[in-house]
């Protein structure tokens, strides 16, 4: 939901609410996915150059593929792969896809349609109500094989048929293709929050994806000014 993506509801609250309603055994997989979301945030914070390089690559690919038919067909759901077309429609109409479906979608985009993962990651962020920059970007990198070098995710016809109860048939996918290659590695960038400058501590800077102020250590502080760093909604399909 948009409440999750903007941090109005944080991950701890989600897990607590879920455990209050369902047993841990029924919740375990869901909790794992929530924790992965948190893990990816921390991972990217320590390696900010991954995000910088993604944006550079995205701009290059947008220029290169802007008018290419295969790209336009993909984002319009007009390919020869029925299940993919249905997922494009579902994503645009419901602003959501099941986690397993997101993996299939990304794999087909990268390895069967042969489109850049950066464009696929952007497409998700344009439409997912629960889109998170870290988990989305790194998830697409992982499917492509550049997040964990040499390890990629390939969607298969039998897997899609099994978990969609044979809803889709005759799914022609590229199921024998090596991972994408990236020789660049990213080291941890040490975070130094000891700023020697004399900063007015009566001001608060808030980002639009972390709005759970009631759960912070400074919820009772009296700030002179609160600054909100926000992306305009027209930059994303969040209404």
Spans of features found by a protein language model:
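C-terminal catalytic domain of photolyase/cryptochrome flavoproteins
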Residues: 1-99, 107, 111-239
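Short, solvent-exposed turn/loop segments enriched in Gly/Ser/Thr/Pro and often Arg
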Residues: 103
């Amino acid at each position: 939901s948009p409440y999750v993506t903007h941090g109005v509801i944080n991950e701890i609250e989600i897990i607590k609410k879920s455990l209050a309603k369902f047993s841990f055994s029924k919740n375990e997989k869901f909790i794992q996915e929530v924790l992965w979301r948190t893990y990816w945030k921390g991972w990217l914070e320590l390696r900010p150059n991954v995000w910088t390089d993604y944006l550079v690559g995205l701009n290059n690919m947008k220029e290169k593929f802007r008018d290419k038919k295969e790209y336009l067909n993909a984002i319009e759901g007009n390919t020869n792969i029925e299940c993919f077309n249905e997922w494009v429609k579902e994503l645009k109409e419901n602003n959501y896809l099941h986690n397993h479906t997101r993996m299939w979608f990304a794999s087909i985009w990268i390895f069967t349609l042969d489109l850049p993962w950066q464009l696929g990651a952007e497409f998700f962020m344009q439409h997912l109500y629960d889109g998170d920059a870290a988990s989305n970007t790194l998830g697409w990198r992982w499917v492509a094989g550049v997040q964990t070098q040499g390890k990629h995710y390939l969607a298969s016809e039998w897997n899609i048929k099994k978990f969609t109860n044979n809803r889709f048939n005759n799914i022609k996918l590229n199921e024998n293709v090596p991972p994408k290659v990236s020789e660049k590695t990213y080291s941890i960038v040490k975070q130094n929050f000891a700023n020697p400058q004399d900063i007015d501590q009566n001001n608060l800077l808030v980002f639009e994806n972390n709005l759970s102020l009631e759960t912070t250590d400074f919820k009772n502080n009296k700030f002179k000014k609160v600054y909100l760093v926000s992306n305009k909604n027209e930059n994303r399909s969040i209404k």
